[in-house]
Design a protein with these regions (language model features):
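N-terminal pre-ligand scaffold of iron-sulfur
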Residues: 1-86, 110-111
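Generic preference for well-ordered secondary structure
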Residues: 6, 11, 16, 20, ...
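Residue-identity detector for glutamine
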Residues: 11, 15, 102, 212-215
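Feature targets compositionally biased, intrinsically disordered low-complexity regions
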Residues: 13, 18, 92-95, 99, ...
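Short Pro/Gly-enriched beta-strand edge/turn motifs at strand-loop
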Residues: 42-54, 91-95, 237-242
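Short solvent-exposed loop/turn micro-motifs enriched in small/polar/acidic residues
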Residues: 54-56, 65, 101-105, 150, ...
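C-terminal catalytic domain of Rieske-type non-heme iron oxygenases
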Residues: 73-79, 108-271
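Long, hydrophobic, well-ordered secondary-structure blocks that form the structural core
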Residues: 78-112
Length: 271
């Protein structure tokens, strides 16, 4: 069969009209990327770090949200502030006894929630954190708040892809079929019985799942290692819009935060 040209493709019945499909330009177009930064990322709450990463007065971390440089610092009174970063080039450190951020041209709304994570938004009139998460943390909130948490590992990677592609890998499970080890040992009835529960503002909670560690070759049950109030060997996961993942499994919590750098580049911070 000869290849179809544009005219022949236009004659194929059942074609979608413009507006009936999502263009692949959403992964590469610079103007779409800029619009996403302004209309999405400037209006959402982002967990920029954990309070344990700012243990003392003057300790700070820098980050960016929607291309805007942010400095998060703990002051003498133990309060944590998020301000516009106009002077600090280090990614983290201590500002010394003269903290001197009071003259910052911009303070951002911030809150410490859900296990001590420092959330920041550029939105000048934001919803409260509870309004923003809309109950999506109910599955793990009690476990995260039971005892003080501490970041014991940090990893950063820059991935050459659009941020939406990365978030998709945390949101779907069809790629599990490509993993031989998972095909043989990981699938059972409860794996497919999970329910994806959707919340306002684009968040999704993947239903609880009991991980059968003792079924993996070389592994054993982890019943003695578990977060408070979390059933033994259980796993909970929250995919938060537009690119945040809270993954609670047994005795460890992993949090992934995306920072889009360009249409084809995204930074992932793993804690």
């Amino acid at each position: 069969m000869p290849a179809r040209n544009h005219t022949k493709w236009k004659q194929v019945p059942g074609q979608l009209e413009v507006g009936e499909y999502v263009s692949s330009k959403i992964y590469s177009d610079e103007n779409i990327f800029k619009k996403e930064m302004n209309t999405i990322f400037r209006n959402v709450w982002i967990p920029v770090c954990h309070e344990s990463e700012l243990p003392g007065a003057g300790d700070f971390r820098t980050t960016t949200i929607a291309g805007e440089s942010i400095l998060v610092v703990r002051e003498e009174g133990n309060t944590i502030h998020a301000i516009k970063n106009t002077f600090e080039r280090r990614p983290r450190g201590n500002m010394g006894p003269e903290i001197g951020f009071q003259d910052s041209p911009k303070f951002y709304h911030s809150d410490i929630k859900f296990g001590g994570f420092v959330w920041v938004t550029l939105n000048e009139n934001p919803p409260t954190m509870d309004e923003w998460v809309d109950g999506s943390f109910n599955c793990m909130k009690e476990s995260l708040n039971a005892e003080p948490l501490d970041v014991f590992h940090y990893h950063k990677a820059i991935i050459p892809c659009n941020y939406k592609l990365w978030h998709d890998t945390n949101s779907e499970f069809y790629h599990d079929y490509l993993h031989f080890h998972n095909r043989v040992t990981g699938f059972n009835d409860s794996y497919f019985a999970r329910e994806n529960k959707c919340f306002n503002n684009g968040h999704v909670n993947v239903g609880s799942f009991e991980v059968q560690y003792d079924q993996y070759e070389g592994f054993e049950s982890r019943e003695e290692l578990s977060f408070p109030y979390l059933p033994t060997n259980h796993w909970e996961m929250i995919d938060m819009f537009p690119g945040i993942n809270f993954n609670l499994r047994g005795s460890a919590l992993r949090v992934d935060v995306m920072t889009p750098l360009s249409p084809d580049k995204v930074m992932i911070e793993f804690r």
